[in-house]
């Protein structure tokens, strides 16, 4: 044998190969802490229906947060803390970095949608905001899309300096002709106009009868408009995209090209250009020729985070389809189909109902898709369509109660899901204002239950010592958390009327914003 020839086993002796064989250390479970709350409800206070939050979304930088409510309003928050507030010398003296949570403050709000009535179909159109999506910023202005059941709007929010009129022909502070003294108010009164515009009245006169001084005005002066130093946030509706959906819009998603976006209803997905509001292209149509043959509907759709030609949409049958826009103008055929096959003999009346996917999210790297159905979270690898790589039980204690949940329609609740920016954890909501955080790295046993309150760990569930697994050669799926029987996962009574449907994960930090009725809670780890 040639002494200089390389043995096949030489690679096994290398340090890199040895390190690859060692089990990788698991990330430690995070300790979640309360950060902030906006709109906290007092004990016994009734919540108005229009104030209930219906959508939450961080922008890509994580410096802005938007919420929408059932009253058609959009509220914007901005980050106030400095990410790098500590100096380099201070950081060098520390043994470990101090966890700082992002702090937000109220920025502005505007009326996005108003209630409407479709006279052709005799249907009321709610003003409720279904989804909010941030668009690319430009010229220090914020851009976002908001939608209700039928209409999508494109908003621009920008700071502008307040302009005031400084020279007037009439001085309302002087005595009027009838001997009475009229007072002027320097405070401006603002009225919200349709599409979020604002009218600002700089002078409030006590009555509509302005009396000229005796002898009249000796001269007339042109009013002078002066731009002050005060800044005022002005929301403006740039585009309105309407009359493109016969059914309720359930999702919108921006494309990575920054120019287009999709909107999806129960049967169709349309492709829009942000600058063209009177034309859209139908790219997915699942409506059969005979509606009696309809077997599934579209529940959610989302663009790939980096590939502008790829998008995924989910269905009420629990499947996720990946489509490539380059294949054809109308994407009747999918590139990949992700679905979990039923175990033999496990089908029941509720099987298809609880399998319906209520939300999907792409991981930041675009490699994985997270989906939420009624009972579970599933993590899918887009390169492996044989089954999910991990399944997380959210509230398994409700499975014996499916009949009761069907009777009160709770089984049709649509919970959202989210992933951390590093892809190591996933989160979703449940009942009793609880939400769950799972570690999704292989072998992780992290399964934390938190409550949307000032004390999130009050109803903490003891984590199992090791995850319950079902390992197969085809799916390599992992099932974790929530296997304990009882009233709920911790033996506490659950409340189906308080449910945490909407939440969002900060794109770069371990921070979660979630909605409990009209309150916005924020937590960090």
Swiss-Prot record:
Designated name of the protein: Serine/threonine protein phosphatase 2A 55 kDa regulatory subunit B beta isoform
Pfam families per the UniProt record, alphabetical: WD40
Keyword entries, A-Z: Repeat, WD repeat
GO molecular function: protein phosphatase regulator activity
Domain of life: Eukaryota
Complexes and interactors: PP2A consists of a common heteromeric enzyme, composed of a catalytic subunit (subunits C), a constant regulatory subunit (subunit A), and a variety of regulatory subunits such as subunits B (the R2/B/PR55/B55, R3/B''/PR72/PR130/PR59 and R5/B'/B56 families).
Region of interest (Disordered), residue spans: 1-31, 169-191
Keyword Repeat among UniProt keywords: yes
Protein task: The B regulatory subunit may modulate substrate selectivity and catalytic activity, and may also direct the localization of the catalytic enzyme to a particular subcellular compartment.
Annotated GO CC locations: protein phosphatase type 2A complex
Biased composition (Low complexity): 171-189
PROSITE patterns: PR55_1, PR55_2, WD_REPEATS_1
Family classification: Belongs to the phosphatase 2A regulatory subunit B family.
InterPro entries from the UniProt entry: PP2A_PR55 (IPR000009), PP2A_PR55_CS (IPR018067), WD40/YVTN_repeat-like_dom_sf (IPR015943), WD40_repeat_dom_sf (IPR036322), WD40_rpt (IPR001680)
Residue ranges of WD repeats: 48-87, 124-165, 244-282, 293-333, 352-390, 495-525
Species per Swiss-Prot/TrEMBL record: Oryza sativa subsp. indica
């Amino acid at each position: 044998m040639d002494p200089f020839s390389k043995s096949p086993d030489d690679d096994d002796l290398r340090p890199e190969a040895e390190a690859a064989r060692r089990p990788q250390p698991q990330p430690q479970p995070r300790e979640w802490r309360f950060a902030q709350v906006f709109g906290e409800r007092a004990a016994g206070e009734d919540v108005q229906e229009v104030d209930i939050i219906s959508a939450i979304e961080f922008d890509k930088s994580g410096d802005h947060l938007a919420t929408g409510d059932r009253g058609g309003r959009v509220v914007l928050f901005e980050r106030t803390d400095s990410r790098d507030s500590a100096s380099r010398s201070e950081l060098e003296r520390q043994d470990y970095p101090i966890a700082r949570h992002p702090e937000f403050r109220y920025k502005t709000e505007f009326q996005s949608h108003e209630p409407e009535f479709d006279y052709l179909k005799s249907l009321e159109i709610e003003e409720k905001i279904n989804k909010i999506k941030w668009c690319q910023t430009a010229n220090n202005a914020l851009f976002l899309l908001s939608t209700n059941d039928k209409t999508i709007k494109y908003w621009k929010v920008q700071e502008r300096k307040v302009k005031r009129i400084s020279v007037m022909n009439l001085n309302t502070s002087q005595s009027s002709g009838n001997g009475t003294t009229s007072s002027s108010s320097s405070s401006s009164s603002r009225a919200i106009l349709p599409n979020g515009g604002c009218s600002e009245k700089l002078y409030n006169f006590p009555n509509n009868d302005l009396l000229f001084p005796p002898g009249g005005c000796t001269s007339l002066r042109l009013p002078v408009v002066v731009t002050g130093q005060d800044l005022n946030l002005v929301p403006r509706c740039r585009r309105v995209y309407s009359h493109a959906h016969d059914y309720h819009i359930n999702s919108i998603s921006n494309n990575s090209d920054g120019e287009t976006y999709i909107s999806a209803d129960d049967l169709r997905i349309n492709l829009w250009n942000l600058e063209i509001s009177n034309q859209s292209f139908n790219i997915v149509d699942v409506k059969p020729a005979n509606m009696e043959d309809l077997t599934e509907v579209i529940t959610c759709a989302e663009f790939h985070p980096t590939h502008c030609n790829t998008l995924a949409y989910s269905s009420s049958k629990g499947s996720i389809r990946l489509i490539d826009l380059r294949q054809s103008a109308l994407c009747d055929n999918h590139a990949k189909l992700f679905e979990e096959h039923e175990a033999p003999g496990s089908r029941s009346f509720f099987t298809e109902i609880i399998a319906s996917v209520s939300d999907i999210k792409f991981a930041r790297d675009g490699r994985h898709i997270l989906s939420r159905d009624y009972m579970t979270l599933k993590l899918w690898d887009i390169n492996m369509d044989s089954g999910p790589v991990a399944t997380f039980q959210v509230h398994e204690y409700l499975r014996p109660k499916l009949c009761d949940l069907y009777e009160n329609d709770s089984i049709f609740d649509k919970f959202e899901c989210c992933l951390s920016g590093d892809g190591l954890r996933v989160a979703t909501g449940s009942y009793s204002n609880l939400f769950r955080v799972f570690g999704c790295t292989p072998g992780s046993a992290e399964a934390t239950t938190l409550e949307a309150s000032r004390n999130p760990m009050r109803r903490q569930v003891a984590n199992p010592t090791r995850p319950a697994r079902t390992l197969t050669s085809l799916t390599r799926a992992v099932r974790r958390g929530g296997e304990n029987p009882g009233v709920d996962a911790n033996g506490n009574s659950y409340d189906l009327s308080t449910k945490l449907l909407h939440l969002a994960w900060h794109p770069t930090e371990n921070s979660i914003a979630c909605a409990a009725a009209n309150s916005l809670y924020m937590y960090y780890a």
